[in-house]
Amino acid sequence: MRKKTDLHSHGTSEKQIEGFVQVRGAREHNLKDVHLDIPRNALVVFTGISGSGKSSLAFGTLYAEAQRRYLESVSPYARRLFHQMSVPEVDSIEGLPPAIALQQQRGAPTTRSSVGSITTLSNSLRMLYSRAGNYPKGQDILYAESFSPNTPEGACPTCHGLGRVYEVTEQSMVPDDSKTIRERAIAAWPPAWHGQNLRDILTTLGYDIDIPWRDLPKKDRKWILFTEEQPVVPVYAGFTLDEVRHALKRKETPSYQGTFTSARKYVLDTFANTESPAMKKRVSQYMVGKECTLCQGKRLRPESLAVTFAGYDITELSRLPLKHLATLLHPYAQENTPDWDKLAAKNPEKAIVTQRIAEDLSNRLSVLLSLGLGYLTLERSTPTLSPGELQRLRLATQVHSNLFGVVYVLDEPSAGLHPADTQALLAALDRLKQAGNSLFVVEHALGVIRHADWIVDVGPEAGEHGGRILYSGPPQGLSEVAESHTRRYLFPDKEADIFAKQPSRSPQGWLQVAGVTRNNLDNLTAAFPLGVLTSVSGVSGSGKSSLVSQVLVELVSKALGQELVAEAEQGESIEHDTPATLGGRITAGMESIKRLVTVDQKPIGRTPRSNLATYTGLFDHVRKLFASTRAAKARHYDAGRFSFNVAKGRCGNCEGEGFVMVELLFLPSVYAPCPVCKGTRFNAKTLEI
């Protein structure tokens, strides 16, 4: 590691940087016994290529140790309620203040979480309506909880605060009415034996399951799909209608007694009661949502929606863009509305409450606007936000909190942010620093790196070839570190222009779309060149993701006849989904497209056992290779024997994890290598191959 550059030579005085966080012997992940001094009360940016060890140092070491020390001051009982990070591999850290982490991660798992809830602006807005709203004559005052769709007091009794009601229809359950019941015309019924059982029961009940669905009498179709009756009848498995009639006449012994369940009842009961995500996902495709007729999609009780402020009910106000909401509230915060004097004279208490809540909302909204988030609405659901938007929302909350003496650890706050908005982000970071806080930022954006007071460059390469501190000091000093990849971009050599223009390719065709309508896109027409790399740009919130990640994917998928399966976030289910209308059409270019592959930012692994080799299928070949050896064949070992997810080959002590958890009461759990397999994850017999 290069020694710290002389502070005076780069315009940063010792007076500006007061004290250091001293890290000694950091060995978390790929860090190689790192010794480092990091200044406090400064903007410190951790740089280096992906996988070099930046996050291991900033989050895995500094933040994890700060959290551990903080939790030591919390009562043992309360400590158990926190999600505690593992104890970092480090000899010592001195001079470390309390830390708050703002990481690149998804928000709450359901769409009931919104911009308003994670910024707590919705709480203030509900208080504003409760204490300062205009009530209809004779209506009693409502508490703030009555303006939340997530509480029994406020949720619409019909849709339970969802804004939509879900039902099943004949068209959704029977997509092809030319099929017979025996040919599985009722797609909503279960597959395999259970579905065959229901078809056999219909035969016993006297229904002909061998004529097209459309030819059945309407009364029969309605009973089969929607009845709540559950008759128990004898079942003659595999018999035709005539054979069943003869068997009943002769009083033959049936195969068994079966209970009939209509298609609607099966779908709704399965969705409500099953614990299988796969079963829930299957039946959800037969459910159709529509806007709740009682609340008109506003999710609240009628008495809550009857209360207004500035002519809006609370849902209408929550649907305004934040910049419009700030404009609406500003006159109330300044006591400058046309009827303010009248309000103050008639109801001074209400005037005071209105002014104070409006002022608080205005101040908090101004921070969001300065971070370029004015296009969002309070009602915007969390899962639809990008990781960068989520992190900037959390950053705005911290800017408004006015904490002092805290370390903020941020993970690429510029991610997804247009360069035009970067200056606003830097201004917010400066406000936190000027308030007496320290900022440790993991970042790749050159604009943020250049703005840093101090740079910690980690590398030189990724993985085992990284984990060393190449440089720690003011930004200008990095220009002297030859092995730094960051230096090449921060201080590019004129002789070797890394930004030299590459030869461009000519389009081999054009994919043209028209009438695109989604979110803020209104009847848009666009053309995408084929056979080339295309970048879709625009400021944050301009509609890039709506166009490319949503509409374009859906239109191409539909044109190819592919089933577009959007993986729900953990905890998501159909009752939280509001289907978006497929707005737009492809006018030309589909003849050149044979396949659609969507690559997004969602985690690829579903379980902790998932790794790069298992996800890509590489490990399948490795297992087959071991199974093909002479020793494995002699022992009759198949490929499954060499999987740490299968009991016959994995270590029985750690169940293929490679480590065991040692649970310590009131302390973070400690993970240690398995004493039986020594971390290899397999049993001794398997390892002999």
Curated annotation (Swiss-Prot):
Q: Which Pfam families match?
A: UvrA_DNA-bind (PF17755)
Give every ABC transporter domain span.
211-491
Question: Main site of residence?
Answer: cytoplasm
Q: What's any GO biological process attached to this entry?
A: SOS response
Q: Where are the zinc fingers (C4-type)?
A: 651-677
- The reply to whether Nucleotide-binding figures as a keyword in the UniProt entry is yes
Q: Which GO terms describe its molecular function?
A: ATP binding; ATP hydrolysis activity; DNA binding; nuclease activity; zinc ion binding
Q: Which residues bind ATP?
A: 48-55, 538-545
Where found?
Answer: Cytoplasm
Q: Which PROSITE patterns match?
A: ABC_TRANSPORTER_1 (PS00211)
Task: Report the function annotation for this chain.
Answer: The UvrABC repair system catalyzes the recognition and processing of DNA lesions. UvrA is an ATPase and a DNA-binding protein. A damage recognition complex composed of 2 UvrA and 2 UvrB subunits scans DNA for abnormalities. When the presence of a lesion has been verified by UvrB, the UvrA molecules dissociate.
Q: Assembly and partners?
A: Forms a heterotetramer with UvrB during the search for lesions.
Q: Its family?
A: Belongs to the ABC transporter superfamily. UvrA family.
According to UniProt, the name of this protein is UvrABC system protein A
| Organism, as annotated | Paucimonas lemoignei (Pseudomonas lemoignei)
Q: What is this protein's gene name?
A: uvrA
